[in-house]
Each structure stands twice: as structure tokens, then as C-alpha cells.
Amino acid sequence: MGLLDLCEEVFGTADLYRVLGVRREASDGEVRRGYHKVSLQVHPDRVGEGDKEDATRRFQILGKVYSVLSDREQRAVYDEQGTVDEDSPVLTQDRDWEAYWRLLFKKISLEDIQAFEKTYKGSEEELADIKQAYLDFKGDMDQIMESVLCVQYTEEPRIRNIIQQAIDAGEVPSYNAFVKESKQKMNARKRRAQEEAKEAEMSRKELGLDEGVDSLKAAIQSRQKDRQKEMDNFLAQMEAKYCKSSKGGGKKSALKKEKK
């Protein structure tokens, strides 16, 4: 099965730009950031053992998508003909996609995360991101809450209020998925979030961590490799925003609009 067919099967679209959530005219930097953002959602280290095989497959396909769009010649062929050269070295080479990902994206520190969160919440950037997520997912709060950075389930009323104000101001359309969301769906989302919070708290206790940054870093450094990976993933969730250049392309266009 070719790359485009795989994308259709796994991501619901054969459009490589839609897979990365970027516009067709996206700069190289925007393509890279799009790859980073989507890859954080499907990275094998972020799922349980039962879902690891599927996540690995998605991650590998995503890496190939980025390889095509980050290669000038391959991207030109795709843009002009809508096809992908399946025999090109870009797609045929045997690559360790996780190692490749680590080379592309550096880690950041816990202090960086805390500093970012402090300035991000309540900022114009967060406001724009929330409205963009609302548009991207056509008002689906499940996906909005998962995609917006630094958001806890307890903040849903705040997020909903921001969106409602944007609707009232005519800045975004009124989607039924948002304004007519059932209480059953809201409660299911709350239960999932509470279960995840409990699991996170149990993991924190297993690691013997208190609330201090220094003790957290010291404990992580002394633990086994698999536990270090878990923290790396937590840190990586912030890289796309924190490391984003202030120059160039601005916000990505909403292209994940095929599924309603």
C-alpha cells in the first residue's frame, strides 16, 4: 500500500498537508512545526502497551509524510502531480523514525515549561489557539481540550466561556457540537480526565516525587530509562510552542475538517 493510501486509512485523508494540519503554502518551518505537533499526539511512548503497535504505525507513516514535504524535490512533485515517488530514497530507506524525531526536536527543561505556562495562560496567543482549535474540530470539546496546551479538565468552564464569547462576538461560527453538546458526553469527558489525573498522581507517588522542581529532576535522573522516557514525553508536549520562532508564517490554517 502506498503512502497516500496509508494516510487515507490511518489519518482519514490522503492530503499530506492535511495530515500535518498545515496549509499547502506552508513554509518549511510551518511544515516542521505541524509534524512536531501531530507527532506528539501519536508518539508510541505516549500510549499503553495495548495501543503501542498502532501508535508506532501511525508514527512511522507520519515520519514519511514529513520526509516527503521536507524534501524540496519530492514536495514539488507532490504539489504539481498529487503523487508520491514510492521508490525514492526518502521513502525506501530503512530509518529509525524515533531516533530521527529526537534529532529534530531538542528537549527543554521543567523550568522552561513552567515559565511558558505562566506567560501562555490568559495570553492573546492562548486565546487565538483556543479559537483555532474550535474551528479545526468544529466545536468538538473532546478534541479541543486535548489539543490546547497547558489545559487541565478543571479549566473546561474557562475554555467554554472563551469560545462562547467568541461566538457571541461573531468571531467564530456556532457549531452544534459545541452549543448542543449532551451532558452525557460532558460527563464522559470529565470521567476520563479524572481517571487520567488519578493515574498521573499514582505515577508521581511511585516515583517518590514531591512538588519541587529540583527533587523532580533529581528523581527522574535516577530512575530507569523507561520512566525517563515518560518525562521526556511530558516535556516534549511543550516544545512546539516554546521553541516556535517569532518570525515567519504565523498561525497554521485549519485543515482537519473532513470529519464532522
From Swiss-Prot:
Region (Required for histone binding), start-end ranges: 171-249
SUPFAM superfamilies: Chaperone J-domain
Tissue: Expressed in heart, placenta, liver, skeletal muscle, kidney, pancreas, thymus, ovary, colon and peripheral blood.
GO biological process: nucleosome assembly; positive regulation of ATP-dependent activity
Region listing for Disordered, in residue ranges: 185-208
Conditions for induction: By heat shock, bacterial lipopolysaccharides (LPS), phorbol 12-myristate 13-acetate (PMA), and the cytokine TNF (at protein level).
Bias (Basic and acidic residues) ranges: 193-208
This protein's GO CC annotations: cytoplasm; cytosol; extracellular space; nucleoplasm; nucleus; plasma membrane; protein folding chaperone complex
Keywords: Cell membrane, Chaperone, Cytoplasm, Membrane, Nucleus, Phosphoprotein
GO molecular function: heat shock protein binding; histone binding; protein-folding chaperone binding
UniProt keyword annotation of Phosphoprotein present: yes
Modified residues (Phosphoserine): S109, S215
Principal cellular location given in the protein's record: nucleus
Record flagged with keyword Membrane: yes
Annotated J domain residues: 15-82
Localization per record: Nucleus; Cytoplasm; Cell membrane
Domain notes: The functional J domain is required for the release from histone-dependent chromatin-binding.
Record text on subunit structure and interactions: Forms a co-chaperone complex with MCM2 and histone H3.3-H4 heterodimers. Within the complex, interacts (via C-terminus) with MCM2 (via N-terminus); the interaction is histone-dependent. Within the complex, interacts (via C-terminus) with histone H3.3-H4 heterodimers; the interaction is direct. Interacts with histones H4, H3.3, H3.2 and H3.1, but not with CENPA or the testis-specific histone H3.1t. Interacts (via J domain) with HSPA1A, HSPA1B and HSPA8. May interact with TONSL; the interaction seems to be histone-dependent.
Free-text function comment from the UniProt entry: Acts as a dual histone chaperone and heat shock co-chaperone. As a histone chaperone, forms a co-chaperone complex with MCM2 and histone H3-H4 heterodimers; and may thereby assist MCM2 in histone H3-H4 heterodimer recognition and facilitate the assembly of histones into nucleosomes. May also act as a histone co-chaperone together with TONSL. May recruit histone chaperones ASF1A, NASP and SPT2 to histone H3-H4 heterodimers. Also plays a role as co-chaperone of the HSP70 family of molecular chaperone proteins, such as HSPA1A, HSPA1B and HSPA8.
Protein name: DnaJ homolog subfamily C member 9
Name of the encoding gene: DNAJC9
